[in-house]
């Protein structure tokens, strides 16, 4: 089992530790609801160093990634990042990822922890057709921390007084230096709140984490575990691999049509997407339930005639709305907001309704 460079800090802070993607990671500190509330109202600091980090380099690096992924990378300039997907030839999702364009010949990729080895092999499998393009795995050398919440800007100003990080637009990034160490600061996140994600060498991670926590004390900062990270992303309707998307799901049936640019040149999975585009059967939708029973992945959804119409992708008690919410993969004709559905939970039918996403407007 791997440990991040911040593992000792989490342990000393009394975090509950779990195995996630092959790493020992904090799932909660003070509690999921309190941590969730801190991010929505103040600031939270996340260790997401378990994510996979790759560099793709070469004169044809952009051309290669344009073929490997669904979004249009030709629209991305130096200092910009892009949410993207890698697909199998049958249209199933290999992974979702963020690609950072350092320059025309250098791209930095952040992929899901549980998929990192699979992703590396998938990229390596296709790179040979693009002469001079190289792939480097930096996962074990780099740390990634996310500072998120409405007070994150004030904390950044304290820690980086000479770098106006708050002028960064969404999905933009820049390199800054802290005590001689180069950091990559990006206006990205997984919470729906204002914030940044910071990539840096492992040896500098503990110092920066401690400095950010200290600087954030007056603003109510808290360390945030994976539990609240999940409730935060679910309130926003963001996809999580293994839930809303996986190798069996086409992105056009998972609210990700905006990431699949059919008008660009060839990419892996394009023909499969073209077929689904002609006749999509399913959609990913949000829903809420009456009562307090919680929907969980794989629970089944039914219509008023008790015919099965879908399955739950993710579910939780929304700390913001104080009601059970979830996402589901459902037959398209039932995916319109306001449609009444039922979810079977431990043998009992619970009334629910399809909701527009995101659940929480930010």
From Swiss-Prot:
Q: Which superkingdom?
A: Bacteria
EC number(s) stated in the UniProt entry for this protein: 2.1.2.10
The UniProt entry's coiled-coil ranges are none
Q: Name one GO biological process term.
A: glycine decarboxylation via glycine cleavage system
The record's catalysed reaction(s) read: N(6)-[(R)-S(8)-aminomethyldihydrolipoyl]-L-lysyl-[protein] + (6S)-5,6,7,8-tetrahydrofolate = N(6)-[(R)-dihydrolipoyl]-L-lysyl-[protein] + (6R)-5,10-methylene-5,6,7,8-tetrahydrofolate + NH4(+)
Q: GO molecular function terms here?
A: aminomethyltransferase activity; transaminase activity
Q: Which UniProt keywords apply?
A: Aminotransferase, Transferase
Kindly list the GO CC terms recorded for this protein: glycine cleavage complex
- Give, as one word, the top-level EC class: transferase
Against Gene3D superfamilies, the record matches this protein to: Aminomethyltransferase beta-barrel domains (3.30.70.1400), Aminomethyltransferase fragment (4.10.1250.10), Probable tRNA modification gtpase trme, domain 1 (3.30.1360.120)
Instruction: Quote any Pfam family the record assigns.
Output: GCV_T
Q: Which family does it belong to?
A: Belongs to the GcvT family.
Q: What does this protein do?
A: The glycine cleavage system catalyzes the degradation of glycine.
Subunit: The glycine cleavage system is composed of four proteins: P, T, L and H.
Q: What is this protein called?
A: Aminomethyltransferase
Q: What taxonomic ancestry is recorded?
A: Bacteria, Pseudomonadati, Chlorobiota, Chlorobiia, Chlorobiales
């Amino acid at each position: 089992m791997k440990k991040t460079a911040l593992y000792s800090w989490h342990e000393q802070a009394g975090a509950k530790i779990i195995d996630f993607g092959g790493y020992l990671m904090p799932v909660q500190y003070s509690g999921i609801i309190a941590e969730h509330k801190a991010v929505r109202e103040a600031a939270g600091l996340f260790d997401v160093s378990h994510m996979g980090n790759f560099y793709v380099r070469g004169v044809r690096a952009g051309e290669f990634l344009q073929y490997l992924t669904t979004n249009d990378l030709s629209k991305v300039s130096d200092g910009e990042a892009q949410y993207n997907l890698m697909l199998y030839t049958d249209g199933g999702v290999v992974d979702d990822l963020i690609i950072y364009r350092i320059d025309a010949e250098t791209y930095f990729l952040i992929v899901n922890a549980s998929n990192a080895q699979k992703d590396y092999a998938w990229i390596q499998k296709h790179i040979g057709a693009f002469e001079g393009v190289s792939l480097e795995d930096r996962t074990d050398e780099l740390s990634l921390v996310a500072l998120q919440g409405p007070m994150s800007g004030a904390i950044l100003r304290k820690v980086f007084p000479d770098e106006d990080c708050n002028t960064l637009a969404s999905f933009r990034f820049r390199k800054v230096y802290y005590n001689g160490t180069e950091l990559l600061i990006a206006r990205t996140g997984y919470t729906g709140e204002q914030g940044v994600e910071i990539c840096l060498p492992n040896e500098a991670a503990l110092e920066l984490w401690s400095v950010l926590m200290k600087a954030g004390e007056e603003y109510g900062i808290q360390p945030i575990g994976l539990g609240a990270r999940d409730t935060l992303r679910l309130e926003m309707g963001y996809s999580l691999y293994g839930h809303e998307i996986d190798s069996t799901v086409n992105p056009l049936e998972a609210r990700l049509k905006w990431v699949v640019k059919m008008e660009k040149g060839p990419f892996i999975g394009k023909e499969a997407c073209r077929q689904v585009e002609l006749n999509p059967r399913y959609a990913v939708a949000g829903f809420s339930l009456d009562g307090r029973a919680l929907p969980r992945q794989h629970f089944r959804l039914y219509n008023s005639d008790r015919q099965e119409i879908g399955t739950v992708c993710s579910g939780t008690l929304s700390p913001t709305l104080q009601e059970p919410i979830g996402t589901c993969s459902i037959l398209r004709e039932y995916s319109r907001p306001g449609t009444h559905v039922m979810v079977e939970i431990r043998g009992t039918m619970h009334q629910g309704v399809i909701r527009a996403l995101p659940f929480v407007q930010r």
